[in-house]
Amino acid sequence: MNYLPTPLNEQPLEGSFSIGLQTRIVLHAQTGELAKTGAKQLKEELHRFAGFEVPILRGEALNGDIALQLASDLPAQGYRLRVDPQGVTVAGADEAGLLHGVQTLRQLIRKSGCELSALQINDAPKLLDRGYYLDVTRGRIPKLSALKALADSLCFYKLNQLQLYIEHTYLYRELTELYRLGDALTAEDIMELDDYCAARGIELVPSFSSFGHLFELLSTKGYASLCELTAAAPSTMPNRMRHHTLNISDERALPLMRAMIAEVMPLFRSRRFNICADETFDLGKERSREELARVGERAYYMGFVKELCAFVAEKGHQPMFWGDIVQRFPDALAELPQGTICLNWGYSPEEKEDATRRLAQAGALQYVCPGVNGWNQWMPPLRDGYENIRRMAAYGKKHGAIGLLNTDWGDYGHINDTLFSLPGLVYGAVFAWCDADASFDELNAAISRVEYLDQSGKVVGLLAQMQAAYACKWYSLVHFKDFAQGNLEVGFDELAGCTDEQAARCNAHLADVMAALRACTPAMDSSTRGMLQAWVVAGEAIRLWNLVGAAVAAGREDAALAAALERWFESYKQLWRATCRESELSRLLDVVTWYAQLLRQGKQG
């Protein structure tokens, strides 16, 4: 694979083109702002990888120039890239297509420098909506600079939509009880990111919880009476995942959600709005039990979703919502406003086609929504992510989905660094763009070369091997701690399976992988070698927590391991703070501290 995503058609031509002193990047008169973005990106790429400072101008291209122009004979978002001895032409069906063509040219320049082999590429996407969905709620809120860097990556791999998952991490003007949680995104943050994304052809779509997953809001004094559950629950990582759902039988519920939606909607250019409405686990469990029993789950759930979608539509926006609940009664989709998009999620590496087929048969306008599978992991299980994304993309194309939204969640404190999700991001970009069924190894080698500038093509394949190094999973450690502290109703014996033998076996495999990663650094460009330290921090996390799990399962004291865990966390904090706000890093510190103390006393007590 020479390009990511793989072009539809590539034809070699005779000769080559040399970037020279008189080469110019020429914007044709009819081009707009996205073309200007592309020109600036090309200028930077040429300086870095071809060694030439190439000026940008607007007008008619001459021999020896790089021309950026529009062409009416191409499909939506399509482009044509031609390199011949007279120069380079990137033609786009529209501004988006032109920018996509520039990304392919950037990758060609990375590979070839100032001497470009003659060729012609004709290309267009299979799915017009290709997105990435980032959790900024469950512990980790990236700095604005990191979100902009993410937008740059989306643009480079021809993704055109970004959604940020928000529950309580936006600074609502009236919800002041949430301010104590700290580091929330502000209106200015969102508007600045929206501008940045728009300049790169990316639609920043608002995504705000408005039914389930409202734990922090419904735990406040002011809004606890709107919670479905009557008793307060401790703010633990598992509880945040499972609770709280809005009591929609309360007449105050709908106006509150409408007001929250209305406050954030104007911050975005997008004419879409994701109300979420997923995993309403507590629906009808306590305060609205009688109402649910009276009308039934379908009418009760869909009634509120219909009200929210209607409100969004009245505001001139296209509603979106997660489709896990409506899967139980897909014919109810007909009750929603025309054009409502159902977000069909499924994250298993063995995900089946049934849900996608069922929604298509019900007439749903749907996105397929796989996941990078990095949540709860120090390093994402790349094989699982690849298999899941590949399958879901294929199902979507087969059953007429209009888009793919690749998810990156942060369950249980968001230990997974977004930097490590990049291979999964690319998997989604590749399978949403084209039909090429790239093998796992082939795709990883291409990502190694294109993203990490690794001439050996090995680094991503080695990262994938870390999936086999876990003897003890993070969620097991969290469950064990919460149960011991009386914050879970049922016990978890998951640590019982973590033995010294298993930890030793996994850590021996991990040591081999880390040694091989270190050996790859001479083949990497100096600008990407800094990733090695981040990968080592993740590898050390896996190694140490394997040992912690085994020691705790055996009831063994190990003060040296406790100290090693605390030293590692200092490195982890540095990695976190390089790209993220402080957010809820303290929650992870609580887990580290609890286990360090347990290791020093050898048993619970």
Feature locations, PLM:
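Conserved oxyanion/phosphate-binding beta-strand-loop segments in alpha/beta enzyme cores
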Residues: 104-127, 155-163, 222, 271, ...
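Beta-rich nucleic-acid/ligand-interaction surfaces
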Residues: 57-65, 170-173, 177-179, 330, ...
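Contiguous, structured surface segment used for ligand recognition
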Residues: 1-130, 391, 414
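Substrate-binding groove of N-acetylhexosamine-processing glycoside hydrolases
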Residues: 1-14, 18-21, 35-39, 81, ...
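Substrate-binding cleft of carbohydrate-active enzyme catalytic domains
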Residues: 128-323, 335, 341-343, 396
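N-terminal small/glycine-rich loop or linker at the start of catalytic domains
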Residues: 119-137, 367-376
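A generic structural motif
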Residues: 30-31, 138-140, 348
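Conserved beta-strand edge residues that scaffold enzyme active sites
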Residues: 60-61, 168-169, 210-212, 326, ...
